[in-house]
Design a protein with these regions (language model features):
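Short, hydrophobic-rich beta-strand element in sensory/regulatory alpha-beta domains
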Residues: 71-74, 80-88, 92-97, 135-137, ...
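Regulatory loop-to-helix N-cap segments in sensory/regulatory domains
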Residues: 2, 6, 10-18, 37, ...
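Signal-transducing coupling segments at domain and membrane junctions
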Residues: 131-136, 143, 148-174, 196-208
Protein backbone atom coordinates (compact mmCIF):
# COMPACT_ATOMS: atom_id res chain seq x y z
CA UNK A 1 0.00 0.00 0.00
CA UNK A 2 2.97 2.34 0.66
CA UNK A 3 3.97 1.99 -2.99
CA UNK A 4 0.41 2.85 -4.04
CA UNK A 5 0.47 6.00 -1.90
CA UNK A 6 3.89 6.96 -3.28
CA UNK A 7 2.71 6.40 -6.85
CA UNK A 8 -0.40 8.51 -6.30
CA UNK A 9 1.73 11.25 -4.74
CA UNK A 10 4.11 11.23 -7.71
CA UNK A 11 1.24 11.44 -10.20
CA UNK A 12 -0.62 14.07 -8.18
CA UNK A 13 2.57 16.06 -7.75
CA UNK A 14 2.92 16.29 -11.52
CA UNK A 15 -0.76 16.97 -12.16
CA UNK A 16 -1.04 19.52 -9.34
CA UNK A 17 2.20 21.44 -9.76
CA UNK A 18 2.31 24.43 -7.45
CA UNK A 19 -0.04 22.93 -4.85
CA UNK A 20 1.52 22.61 -1.36
CA UNK A 21 3.10 19.19 -0.79
CA UNK A 22 1.06 18.49 2.36
CA UNK A 23 -2.20 18.92 0.40
CA UNK A 24 -0.99 16.56 -2.33
CA UNK A 25 0.08 14.02 0.31
CA UNK A 26 -3.29 14.29 2.05
CA UNK A 27 -5.20 13.71 -1.18
CA UNK A 28 -2.96 10.76 -2.05
CA UNK A 29 -3.56 9.17 1.35
CA UNK A 30 -7.32 9.64 1.02
CA UNK A 31 -7.37 7.96 -2.41
CA UNK A 32 -5.18 5.14 -1.12
CA UNK A 33 -7.53 4.63 1.84
CA UNK A 34 -10.50 4.33 -0.51
CA UNK A 35 -8.59 1.77 -2.59
CA UNK A 36 -7.69 -0.12 0.59
CA UNK A 37 -11.29 -0.19 1.81
CA UNK A 38 -12.56 -1.30 -1.61
CA UNK A 39 -9.99 -4.12 -1.77
CA UNK A 40 -10.87 -5.30 1.72
CA UNK A 41 -14.55 -5.20 0.83
CA UNK A 42 -13.96 -7.27 -2.30
CA UNK A 43 -11.99 -9.86 -0.34
CA UNK A 44 -14.80 -10.08 2.20
CA UNK A 45 -17.36 -10.54 -0.59
CA UNK A 46 -15.31 -13.34 -2.16
CA UNK A 47 -15.06 -15.06 1.23
CA UNK A 48 -18.83 -14.76 1.63
CA UNK A 49 -19.39 -16.29 -1.81
CA UNK A 50 -17.23 -19.29 -0.94
CA UNK A 51 -19.17 -19.86 2.29
CA UNK A 52 -22.51 -19.48 0.50
CA UNK A 53 -21.45 -21.92 -2.22
CA UNK A 54 -20.45 -24.53 0.34
CA UNK A 55 -23.72 -24.06 2.19
CA UNK A 56 -25.83 -24.42 -0.95
CA UNK A 57 -23.98 -27.51 -2.14
CA UNK A 58 -24.50 -29.24 1.21
CA UNK A 59 -28.26 -28.59 1.42
CA UNK A 60 -30.30 -31.78 1.00
CA UNK A 61 -33.87 -30.45 1.09
CA UNK A 62 -35.23 -28.84 -2.09
CA UNK A 63 -37.52 -26.39 -0.26
CA UNK A 64 -34.78 -25.25 2.09
CA UNK A 65 -32.38 -24.92 -0.85
CA UNK A 66 -34.75 -22.65 -2.78
CA UNK A 67 -35.36 -20.52 0.31
CA UNK A 68 -31.67 -20.33 1.06
CA UNK A 69 -30.78 -19.20 -2.45
CA UNK A 70 -33.00 -16.14 -2.09
CA UNK A 71 -32.07 -15.48 1.53
CA UNK A 72 -28.32 -15.64 0.87
CA UNK A 73 -28.61 -13.39 -2.19
CA UNK A 74 -30.65 -10.88 -0.21
CA UNK A 75 -28.19 -10.91 2.68
CA UNK A 76 -25.27 -10.50 0.29
CA UNK A 77 -26.80 -7.42 -1.36
CA UNK A 78 -28.80 -6.21 1.68
CA UNK A 79 -31.98 -6.40 -0.42
CA UNK A 80 -35.40 -6.01 1.19
CA UNK A 81 -37.07 -8.47 -1.16
CA UNK A 82 -36.30 -11.33 -3.47
CA UNK A 83 -38.11 -13.63 -5.89
CA UNK A 84 -36.88 -16.87 -7.41
CA UNK A 85 -38.41 -18.13 -10.65
CA UNK A 86 -37.85 -21.62 -12.04
CA UNK A 87 -37.95 -22.03 -15.80
CA UNK A 88 -40.30 -24.63 -17.25
CA UNK A 89 -38.83 -25.04 -20.71
CA UNK A 90 -41.54 -27.34 -22.05
CA UNK A 91 -44.23 -24.73 -21.36
CA UNK A 92 -42.05 -21.66 -21.98
CA UNK A 93 -42.86 -20.09 -18.61
CA UNK A 94 -41.26 -18.91 -15.38
CA UNK A 95 -42.92 -20.36 -12.27
CA UNK A 96 -42.76 -18.53 -8.95
CA UNK A 97 -40.73 -20.66 -6.53
CA UNK A 98 -39.89 -18.28 -3.67
CA UNK A 99 -41.09 -14.79 -2.72
CA UNK A 100 -39.57 -12.98 0.27
CA UNK A 101 -39.99 -9.41 1.53
CA UNK A 102 -38.86 -8.30 4.97
CA UNK A 103 -40.80 -5.02 5.10
CA UNK A 104 -44.08 -6.72 4.20
CA UNK A 105 -43.42 -9.86 6.22
CA UNK A 106 -43.95 -11.99 3.11
CA UNK A 107 -42.30 -15.43 2.92
CA UNK A 108 -43.98 -17.59 0.30
CA UNK A 109 -43.02 -20.75 -1.51
CA UNK A 110 -40.67 -23.50 -0.39
CA UNK A 111 -41.76 -24.62 3.07
CA UNK A 112 -43.98 -21.53 3.46
CA UNK A 113 -47.29 -20.44 2.00
CA UNK A 114 -48.12 -21.82 -1.45
CA UNK A 115 -47.75 -19.25 -4.25
CA UNK A 116 -50.88 -19.04 -6.38
CA UNK A 117 -49.72 -16.22 -8.65
CA UNK A 118 -49.83 -16.91 -12.39
CA UNK A 119 -46.65 -17.93 -14.17
CA UNK A 120 -44.70 -15.49 -16.32
CA UNK A 121 -44.90 -16.43 -20.02
CA UNK A 122 -41.70 -16.33 -22.04
CA UNK A 123 -43.67 -16.01 -25.25
CA UNK A 124 -46.75 -13.93 -26.04
CA UNK A 125 -48.74 -15.96 -28.55
CA UNK A 126 -47.85 -14.93 -32.09
CA UNK A 127 -46.08 -11.79 -30.88
CA UNK A 128 -42.82 -13.58 -30.20
CA UNK A 129 -40.68 -13.43 -27.09
CA UNK A 130 -41.84 -11.61 -23.98
CA UNK A 131 -39.23 -8.91 -23.51
CA UNK A 132 -41.68 -6.55 -21.82
CA UNK A 133 -41.43 -8.49 -18.57
CA UNK A 134 -38.00 -7.93 -17.03
CA UNK A 135 -37.67 -11.45 -15.60
CA UNK A 136 -38.74 -13.06 -18.88
CA UNK A 137 -36.27 -10.82 -20.71
CA UNK A 138 -33.50 -11.96 -18.37
CA UNK A 139 -34.37 -15.63 -18.93
CA UNK A 140 -34.51 -15.19 -22.70
CA UNK A 141 -31.28 -13.21 -23.07
CA UNK A 142 -29.30 -14.67 -20.19
CA UNK A 143 -28.18 -11.15 -19.29
CA UNK A 144 -28.52 -9.36 -15.93
CA UNK A 145 -30.67 -6.24 -15.60
CA UNK A 146 -29.85 -3.57 -13.01
CA UNK A 147 -32.50 -0.86 -12.54
CA UNK A 148 -32.16 2.12 -10.20
CA UNK A 149 -35.89 2.88 -10.07
CA UNK A 150 -38.49 0.66 -11.72
CA UNK A 151 -40.94 3.58 -11.94
CA UNK A 152 -38.52 5.39 -14.27
CA UNK A 153 -37.36 2.33 -16.23
CA UNK A 154 -37.90 2.29 -19.98
CA UNK A 155 -38.43 -0.77 -22.14
CA UNK A 156 -40.19 -2.91 -19.53
CA UNK A 157 -43.78 -3.11 -18.29
CA UNK A 158 -43.91 -2.60 -14.52
CA UNK A 159 -47.66 -2.03 -14.26
CA UNK A 160 -48.00 -5.19 -12.18
CA UNK A 161 -45.36 -3.86 -9.79
CA UNK A 162 -47.18 -0.54 -9.52
CA UNK A 163 -50.47 -2.34 -8.83
CA UNK A 164 -48.80 -4.43 -6.12
CA UNK A 165 -47.37 -1.30 -4.51
CA UNK A 166 -50.74 0.45 -4.64
CA UNK A 167 -52.45 -2.46 -2.88
CA UNK A 168 -49.79 -2.91 -0.17
CA UNK A 169 -48.44 0.61 0.39
CA UNK A 170 -44.99 -0.61 -0.60
CA UNK A 171 -42.62 1.31 -2.89
CA UNK A 172 -40.60 -0.84 -5.26
CA UNK A 173 -37.52 1.03 -6.41
CA UNK A 174 -34.16 -0.59 -7.18
CA UNK A 175 -34.13 -4.01 -8.83
CA UNK A 176 -31.44 -6.49 -9.86
CA UNK A 177 -32.46 -9.42 -12.08
CA UNK A 178 -29.97 -12.26 -12.54
CA UNK A 179 -30.14 -15.46 -14.64
CA UNK A 180 -29.43 -18.82 -13.03
CA UNK A 181 -27.14 -20.73 -15.39
CA UNK A 182 -26.39 -24.40 -14.86
CA UNK A 183 -23.17 -26.30 -15.66
CA UNK A 184 -24.21 -26.46 -19.33
CA UNK A 185 -24.73 -22.68 -19.43
CA UNK A 186 -28.49 -23.10 -19.74
CA UNK A 187 -30.75 -20.61 -17.97
CA UNK A 188 -32.85 -22.67 -15.54
CA UNK A 189 -34.27 -19.82 -13.50
CA UNK A 190 -34.19 -16.14 -12.63
CA UNK A 191 -33.35 -14.40 -9.36
CA UNK A 192 -34.97 -11.00 -8.85
CA UNK A 193 -33.74 -8.83 -5.96
CA UNK A 194 -35.66 -5.75 -4.85
CA UNK A 195 -34.77 -2.57 -2.97
CA UNK A 196 -31.13 -2.69 -1.94
CA UNK A 197 -30.62 -0.84 1.34
CA UNK A 198 -27.69 1.21 2.53
CA UNK A 199 -26.17 -0.78 5.39
CA UNK A 200 -25.66 2.33 7.53
CA UNK A 201 -28.76 4.47 6.87
CA UNK A 202 -31.29 1.86 5.73
CA UNK A 203 -32.24 4.04 2.77
CA UNK A 204 -33.17 2.27 -0.47
CA UNK A 205 -30.32 2.65 -2.98
CA UNK A 206 -29.42 1.25 -6.42
CA UNK A 207 -27.62 -2.10 -6.50
CA UNK A 208 -23.87 -1.34 -6.86
CA UNK A 209 -22.52 -2.15 -10.30
CA UNK A 210 -19.45 -3.87 -8.85
CA UNK A 211 -21.70 -6.38 -7.04
CA UNK A 212 -23.48 -7.61 -10.18
CA UNK A 213 -20.70 -9.99 -11.19
CA UNK A 214 -20.53 -11.43 -7.70
CA UNK A 215 -24.29 -11.97 -7.54
CA UNK A 216 -24.06 -13.73 -10.91
CA UNK A 217 -21.41 -16.00 -9.41
CA UNK A 218 -23.72 -16.71 -6.48
CA UNK A 219 -26.57 -17.45 -8.89
CA UNK A 220 -24.38 -19.87 -10.85
CA UNK A 221 -23.50 -21.72 -7.66
CA UNK A 222 -27.20 -21.84 -6.81
CA UNK A 223 -28.07 -23.19 -10.26
CA UNK A 224 -25.46 -25.93 -10.01
CA UNK A 225 -26.67 -26.94 -6.54
CA UNK A 226 -30.27 -27.01 -7.77
CA UNK A 227 -29.37 -29.07 -10.84
CA UNK A 228 -27.38 -31.50 -8.71
CA UNK A 229 -30.33 -31.99 -6.36
CA UNK A 230 -32.70 -32.58 -9.27
CA UNK A 231 -30.38 -35.23 -10.71
CA UNK A 232 -30.08 -36.97 -7.35
CA UNK A 233 -33.85 -36.99 -6.97
Amino acid sequence: MHKIVQGIEDYAGQAMAGVPAEIVAGLAERVAQEIREFSEGQSDHIYQLVKIGLGLSSEKNIDRLLERIVREARNFTNADGGTLYIRESERDILDFAIVQNDSLGVFMGGSGEVISWPSVPLRLGDNGENHRNVSAHCALTGEPVNISDVYDAEGFDFQGTRDFDASTGYRSRSMLVIPLRDHEDEVIGVLQLLNAKDRETGAVVPFPVHEVGMVMSLASQAAIALTKMRLVR
